[in-house]
Amino acid sequence: MHHHWHRSFILHRRSYSETSLILDLLTENEGRISLIAKGALRPRSALKGYLQPFTPLLLRWSGKSAIKTLCGAEPISIAVPLTGIFLYSGLYVNELLSRLLLPNIDYRALFFDYLDCLEALASAQDTSERALRRFELALLTHLGYGVDFLHCVETGEPVVAQMTYRYQHEIGFIRSPEDDSLGFTGHQLQSLAKGAFYDQETLKAAKRFTRIALKPHLGHRPLNSRSLFRKFNL
């Protein structure tokens, strides 16, 4: 029996039989786990209303199999208020985590980066792109794929703002011709290292880099959430 309560968020939920749910979770202390919530879809179930994505939860469970059994659930607060483009962005973040996180690994720091991302999306006024790019870069680091934006791997020397560099997967940035369509300027890399996405040029560079860096880990299966907000060009 797992007696402890854990702060958790639901990344994805799906029906199981007529009355139960399978929940894919990000938890503070135990990383990504899967639970079965028995009876959660029954008409009088108290669980039905708050076993939803973006609702901060306290959960406890039991079992030794890959899919645990939910034993208790309490909402910590109401759901993080996400609508429109910001809701689609949250679904994208959830799908990234479901696809990329290995189960039962401690991702405690990532849990708080995820919470920060949701809060940033909830408070954003115009665009979700800054919050998404910061989270994608943090996710790469937590997965062990962090990138040194400030040095050329060929020489070990600091990148030069006026020069052009190309990213080599799991290696780093190498010198590249100025007209390289896949290149990044040293200035852009310096901005990415700071997480400083204050202008559209840097935001576009950040988006291009995270797409390149995440693609090998996501494989060929497309993200379902991207089809929801393709019209927003995220």
Curated annotation (Swiss-Prot):
Name of the protein in its database record: DNA repair protein RecO
A Pfam family per the record: RecO_N
InterPro entries noted in UniProt: ARFGAP/RecO, DNA_rep/recomb_RecO_N, NA-bd_OB-fold, RecO, RecO_C
Xref: Gene3D superfamilies: Nucleic acid-binding proteins, Recombination protein O, C-terminal domain
GO biological process terms, semicolon-separated: DNA recombination; double-strand break repair
Entry-linked PANTHER family: DNA REPAIR PROTEIN RECO (PTHR33991:SF1)
Domain of life, per lineage: Bacteria
Keywords of this entry: DNA damage, DNA recombination, DNA repair
DNA repair in keyword set: yes
Cellular compartments per GO CC: bacterial nucleoid
Family stated for the protein in its record: Belongs to the RecO family.
Function: Involved in DNA repair and RecF pathway recombination.
Gene, per the UniProt record: recO
Family matches, as SUPFAM superfamilies: ArfGap/RecO-like zinc finger (SSF57863), Nucleic acid-binding proteins (SSF50249)
